[in-house]
Amino acid sequence: MTLDLNKLRFGSELIKRGFSAMTKGGVIMDVTTADQAKIAEAAGAVAVMALERVPADIRAAGGVARMADPMKIKEIMDAVSIPVMAKVRIGHISEAYVLEKIGVDMLDESEVLTPADPFFHLYKKNLTVPVVSGARNLPEAVRRIFEGAAMIRTKGEAGTGNIIEAVRHIRKVNEEISVLKRMSDEQLRAVASNISASYFVLREEASKDLMGVEGKLSYDSAYAGMGRSRIEREILAILRQIRRMGRLPVVNFAAGGVATPADGALMMELGADGVFVGSGIFKSPNPEKMARSIVEAVENYRDYDVVEKASEGLQGMPGVDIESIPKDMRLQERGW
């Protein structure tokens, strides 16, 4: 029987999660050209993220950041043999279907781009292509998994070259899982109810607009055709799975601020399953060497002879102090 490679990449939740797990232990690099994609592949990247501008340039330019030009994505896909991912705006259903049609291997519903929907993220179970989503804490991760994310990543603060927010996010997820493991079923139900609340914001606004007060309308079909009871039940099932496994049921990568080999090693030490590097490679003075060095450090993160050697002779991208960025301008604040 001949295997259909497309069916191995796309389709059921199990297949989508399995494809995502194949990148475990590796580095995924942002690229904006076919030449950069070739550099990433030669350096040992397990996948590339095709986009028009790296996060540092998106941050500097301001305005509205959208899906990359499909022609640019196709050029990158034609240039390399490793998987190619692409970013989609939060909640932008049509961008997601366009990228799926192109044949990208995975989508990133990304806060780096300007959100399209003020109420909802994509219902990723309607897509055949796997999707990665960012999370700052366990509730955000659980919501994205409920929606169908096949991979979670920290949000960090993209484009800053500053690792502190990625560290904050993975530590919060780890701590909250540790607490969750000791919870009773009754406590888990309360957590599920709290995590579910963001799916009813639109219905509450409709109630206030129409009835003058919140809470006057039912929660039937509040999100993706599901009402409150089903949403809470499915989220509770995910929480029980996390409690049983002692970790997220999907791979959890680090992203947002990784700028040096030591940054990559740090995130692996803290429990990340792999690392995304956005601006840190092609905003550094020597992208080829930086790319190789980060891959070496991530793959050998507990061998500090290797990490030290990988760090020699490198200069990272210019960094940004997080405290200098107003909270409402921080990309990590996008999403719900």
Swiss-Prot record:
CDD domains: pdxS. GO terms for molecular function: pyridoxal 5'-phosphate synthase (glutamine hydrolysing) activity. One of its GO terms (biological process) is pyridoxal phosphate biosynthetic process. It is an enzyme of class 4 (lyase). Pathway: Cofactor biosynthesis; pyridoxal 5'-phosphate biosynthesis. Its EC number is 4.3.3.6. Keywords: Lyase, Pyridoxal phosphate, Schiff base. The active site is at residue 87. It catalyses: aldehydo-D-ribose 5-phosphate + D-glyceraldehyde 3-phosphate + L-glutamine = pyridoxal 5'-phosphate + L-glutamate + phosphate + 3 H2O + H(+). Belongs to the PdxS/SNZ family. In the presence of PdxT, forms a dodecamer of heterodimers. This is Pyridoxal 5'-phosphate synthase subunit PdxS.
